[in-house]
A protein has these predicted regions:
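The feature marks proteins involved in alpha-glucan
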Residues: 1-23, 30-39
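A Trp-anchored, charged/polar loop motif used as the substrate-binding/catalytic surface
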Residues: 2-8, 47-50, 184-188, 282-296
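Extracellular/periplasmic catalytic domains that process cell-envelope and extracellular macromolecules
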Residues: 13-18, 57-58, 230-232, 297-300
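Extracellular structured ligand-interaction cores
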Residues: 17-27, 58-63, 91, 171, ...
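Beta-sheet entry/capping signal
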Residues: 19-20, 62-65, 121-123, 199-200, ...
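Substrate-binding/active-site clefts of carbohydrate-active enzymes
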Residues: 27-197, 202-228, 273, 292
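Conserved alpha/beta catalytic core and glycan-binding cleft of carbohydrate-active enzymes
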Residues: 197, 212-213, 217-318
Length: 318
């Protein structure tokens, strides 16, 4: 990892209480920007172009969070309809940037993008999807892990191993309680942190990563491994604290050191915006959601406050 020349670029290391996150999509953010050269639009190089960086900087953003950039295929049901997977929440290559976002510089364009944001004092956070893969359910394609060791990499029904536990709503669930699978996830995170100088991660359906055979455990294998890792434990770690599995809603339940998407903040602010009588709840959310984060050594910054994101409606559509 240290063989890459980062030209003395250093991570900004923004304190959590001062962090302002901007969720963005590499292609969606750049593909129509006339200030970016046509050959760079829709690419990592376009995302790292001066026009992109200066705009984000002008907003007062401290951390840009990129929607999934791990390699992902287009689902067959989309291809059959002449469509493509735009968001990218169906990863398969956990160690490879999505080549569809490559510009003329290839993978170096990703590193150049990260360096451009670091030089501007802005962190780069990746939205990562380790909870499921693009291989789908028992009717889905065998692209990688199914063929390597199906029962190791995926959680299957105890009495019918042909069928997958579907706590993700996508057809399969990655078995992060298996030591080799956990090792793969940790190796992937270290690769992005060290070789690509990423400053943090937002974990899609993060509850799944903490679900052990007996249920969700904030002291479980995944959380324990991250806490003990000398590199990852120093990064910004943000969980989406829910899934559709048993006990899946875990807002306020992640371990110390983690931030969480706070949907109670989102919903309360939108209700207040509409004129609903939620003044007390609104005040509690603005003051740090102490009912959720004033325990177990957690801090107000653990609440990642947002009103809208890539999921759901725009604010005016509430």
């Amino acid at each position: 990892p240290n063989a890459v020349d980062w030209q003395d670029s250093r991570p900004p290391d923004i304190p959590w209480p001062h962090t302002v996150v901007y969720e963005s999509h590499v292609k969606g953010f750049t593909q129509l920007n006339p200030a970016i050269p046509p050959e760079l639009r829709g690419t990592f190089e376009g995302m790292g172009h001066k026009a992109s960086v200066e705009y984000i900087k002008s907003l007062g953003i401290t951390s840009v969070e990129l929607l999934p950039v791990h390699w992902f295929p287009d689902d067959q049901h989309l291809l059959d309809r002449g469509l493509k997977n735009f968001w990218g929440y169906n990863s398969l290559g956990f160690f490879a940037p999505a080549s569809r976002y490559y510009g003329p510089a290839g993978i170096q364009g990703f590193r150049d993008m990260v360096r451009a944001y670091h030089d501007a004092g802005i962190e780069v956070i990746l939205d990562v999807v380790y909870n499921h893969t693009a291989e789908g359910n028992e009717l889905g394609p065998t692209l990688s892990f199914k063929g390597i060791d199906n029962f190791c990499y995926y959680r299957t029904m105890p009495d019918q191993h042909r069928y997958y536990i579907n706590d993700t709503g996508t057809g399969n669930t990655v078995n992060t309680s298996h030591p080799r699978v956990l090792q793969m996830v940790m190796d992937s995170l270290r690769y992005w942190a060290e070789s690509m100088q990423i400053d943090g991660f937002r974990f899609d359906l993060g509850t799944i990563l903490g679900r052990e055979p007996e249920g969700f455990d904030p002291r479980g294998g995944f959380f324990d491994a991250v806490t003990q890792d000398p590199v990852l434990s120093k990064l910004k770690l943000i969980g989406e604290p829910w899934d559709i599995g048993p006990g899946g809603y875990q807002v306020g339940g992640f371990p110390p050191g983690w931030g969480e998407w706070n949907d109670k903040y989102r919903d309360t602010v939108r209700e207040y915006w509409k004129g609903d009588n939620v003044s007390n709840d609104f005040a509690a959310r603005l003051l740090g959601s102490g009912d959720l984060y004033d325990q177990r050594g957690r801090r107000p910054w653990a609440s990642v406050n947002f009103i809208t994101a890539h999921d759901g409606f725009t604010p005016v559509s509430n």
